[in-house]
């Protein structure tokens, strides 16, 4: 049974298969090898995908797009809140998750991003089945390099809903590098510049010339792509219209906004074919007697978007820094994604790396799906990680758990290669503990409140009578897909403790990964002070608990024992609030010892 490769993009998606010794994209029922990532819900109860959804003559609230920008995210994520105004369809808060409110045939239903994405995947699956004349159940899928754990899990869930088992999940720039490497089979260092419709990724890969491809570094932005260029052009066109006429542009009218967006996309494409000027022409009303007509030259286009374009170079520099490289160390630069067709983008990359290093012969719209298809072919050949194609990718943010007091303990460090497995030894906090939670975080700060919660493991001790400090071992595992699993083992009974892991944490802050790292570096002193206080509190509380155990085992009278335990609880309660100075723990411990001695002597 054939395993296919799918690039599920923000604006366009693509499916490919490896046959006759090479990868090739599969044409859909509309005769195109890329499919717009658009879903429409007309009133007849049907579901339309791609071109037919884009052209559907139905209210815009029934046409869904941009799903990749909020799949696996939380309602209060910054990017979700910022994007709400730009979407013609309704997105609402459903138990902390962004859900799409779809009105179809006078009935309103809630659709998750995973469900919406699964419709696109079903369409691609059907296209592949029609081409191959067989049932397809397995897929290699690609995701942006800096997708977090929740976004990866949600993408895999979308595939499951579409009837597809994800046999491997790889980063988009890694897939592009695979597509190039299998054609050239050379010992080179490759930089992949992946500028798509909704996300931007950079990866640096080293090839041995034997099919072995190692990802040295990667960086990116989850919310930077061609659609952001479209928004800049729309804002410019609206501003020009408002300045020239007495009327204000009707931004509240979704029909008019759709026409303007389509006109801006058309102008962007025209200027991407080396034309020096074009016009943004868009009708204002349904009578077509009033319109926006804005002249847009190549120079003006570059000026409007230059900060955005140059911002991608900052991310390129971050990837180079992570790999401990300079631009001169790069042998080839792969331009991938539809936005790399823009002349100014090519010019900036040419200026940075030199014209001779730019690889433009690889199809930017198809490269990622083709790379996924190559990986699929090698997996299908019978070896999960075949010798001919070794892919090693890296962890982009450290992963760990929250310890007592809100201290973040890194288990898997940023920059480590996966698959990998790490263990952490833990202990219960109180006597006779029956249940507990182990929050899982991603981030670089020592204070968990500044990191991002990605899940939680619930520990159930089955009503065991256990003492404080009961030994546990947590196993953190990142599989070949870059997805995380956590299990906990009772080291004394050697049995797995029942656990439940869910991706339900706080909102993801939409900032560059390198900025997260820079914040951690800038706040290192504050974090170290916090860690010192937490460690001192742990030592203080351990001393108080040891004394509590001694009191409980002692032969003093019940009255004295009760009074002594009351003193213990008073000093434990004091430690719940962190003091300002380290010395306070020493002072309070001395006071505790003196006060409790009154009842235990």
Name every feature range the model reports, one short phrase each:
Residues 1-82, 87-94, 101-119, 126-601:
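Oxyanion-binding/catalytic loops of NTP- or PPi-dependent enzymes
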